[in-house]
Amino acid sequence: DVPPIIAALISTEDVRYRGHSGIDLMSLVRVGVKTVLMQNTSQGGGSTITQQLAKNLFPRDTARNRSRVARTAKLVTSKFKEWITALKLEYNYTKEEIAAMYLNTVEFGSNAYGIKSAAHTFFNKEPHELNIQEAALLAGLVKGPTMYSPRRNPENALARRNLVLDRMASA
């Protein structure tokens, strides 16, 4: 039986999580087409949970005083490092271990980093005590901890939680 927080995370952040080895080629192609053909350079949408973990473990250098070419080169280099790290993580750990590591490193907002801190901050519970609605709310925070904060933006938090619940039901 998959804990609700894991089910919520996978259904929202990486629906093909169990079927790839750290890099989701279908998502990469989709993002590539969106970026190149449609000239849509909005960030996000192609990283797997494993890639997001790699990024959390080894943050990018975000210096802003570089030229556009230098920033692009740095982004490409960091993406390749992220992919290699994701493949190594998948080789050395189980999917359950990777999901747990991710949940223990991600920001949930309100100064809560990691699922244990988030469960205590928002619900005064241990992670294993979360019900499906609470797990869905926390999983929804990952995309935008401030935008979907139940404290700052309760309407957004509720709508995001409901989206996560819908995705869980569809999975």
Per-region residue spans from a language model:
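Peptidoglycan glycan-strand catalytic modules in the bacterial/periplasmic cell-wall system
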Residues: 1-171
